[in-house]
């Protein structure tokens, strides 16, 4: 059995790490490189960086901080933000990133997933899916351009359909960003994760809602996700990664202990 992964997420805007609640009202957390270094030293398995306004601004991720992160950490890291072409992806990988993640650009042009997978290999192509639960209809819908509140829109895709579509097109991993849960720290949406797990045959990463160590355990044990991504609990030092991993190991979760 492959070890489960603990993945801190760093949302980047204007060269700094920020964090919002349900993708809104972002506050500044701190500088990118020191945070990345701290998480690597605490025992994170991987880091994910989202330049949250790159897609809506029509630009690609800034090279300067990607290169600096690559210099100070020795764990894999994934970068997302405005990647719309093979050239964009090649640049970011050349800066030192191990994986690239696409989200809004994939919705605009789904063939991008296949072209990236063919060029760089499925192992480094992650598709992020921003999913919102509509209580009125009881359905999960995919959102686009969520880094900019003024441009965020609900797409025609239902989440389960899009999960299947991106796999057909070559996604090597899926990060499910559950917007309703984002930043509120009351647990991952296990119901949604279980439904997605049934149709997701590539590594699935849960994102949105972690507030306690038990929430991570539930995601691994009850929804069988491959990794759990979180931001607030790590940024605010509510949970220490090393202590979290020790706890999970005592609960029978296969995890890499540093």
Swiss-Prot record:
It is found in: Cytoplasm. Pathway: Amino-acid biosynthesis; L-histidine biosynthesis; L-histidine from 5-phospho-alpha-D-ribose 1-diphosphate: step 5/9. One of its GO terms (biological process) is L-histidine biosynthetic process. Heterodimer of HisH and HisF. It comes from the Bacteria. InterPro entries: Aldolase_TIM, His_biosynth, HisF, IGPS_HisA/HisF, RibuloseP-bd_barrel. The keyword Cytoplasm applies. Its EC number is 4.3.2.10. The keyword Cytoplasm applies. Gene3D superfamilies: Aldolase class I (3.20.20.70). Its main location: cytoplasm. Belongs to the HisA/HisF family. It holds the Pfam family His_biosynth. This is Imidazole glycerol phosphate synthase subunit HisF. Keywords: Amino-acid biosynthesis, Cytoplasm, Histidine biosynthesis, Lyase. NCBIfam families: hisF.
């Amino acid at each position: 059995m492959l070890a489960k992964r603990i993945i801190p997420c760093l949302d980047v805007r204007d060269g700094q790490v920020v964090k919002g609640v349900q993708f809104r009202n972002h506050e500044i957390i701190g500088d990118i490189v020191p945070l990345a270094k701290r998480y690597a030293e605490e025992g994170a398995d991987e880091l994910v960086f989202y330049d949250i306004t790159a897609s809506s601004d029509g630009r690609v991720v800034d090279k300067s901080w990607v290169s600096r992160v690559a210099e100070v950490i020795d764990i894999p890291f994934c970068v997302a933000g405005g990647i719309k072409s093979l050239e964009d992806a090649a640049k970011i990988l050349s800066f030192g990133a191990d994986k690239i993640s696409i989200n809004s650009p994939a919705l605009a042009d789904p063939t991008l997933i296949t072209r990236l997978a063919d060029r760089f290999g499925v192992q480094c192509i992650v598709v992020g899916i921003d999913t919102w639960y509509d209580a009125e209809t009881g359905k999960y819908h995919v959102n686009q351009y969520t880094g900019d509140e003024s441009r965020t829109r609900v797409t025609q895709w239902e989440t389960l359909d899009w999960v299947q579509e991106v796999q057909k097109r070559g996604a090597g991993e899926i990060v499910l960003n559950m917007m309703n849960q984002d930043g509120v720290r009351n647990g991952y949406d296990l119901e949604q994760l279980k439904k997605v797990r049934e149709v997701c045959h590539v590594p699935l990463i849960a994102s949105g809602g972690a507030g306690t160590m038990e929430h991570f355990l539930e995601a691994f044990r009850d929804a069988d996700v491959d990794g759990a991504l979180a931001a607030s609990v790590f940024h605010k030092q509510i949970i220490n990664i090393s202590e979290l991993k020790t706890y999970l190991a005592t609960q029978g979760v296969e995890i890499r202990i540093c």
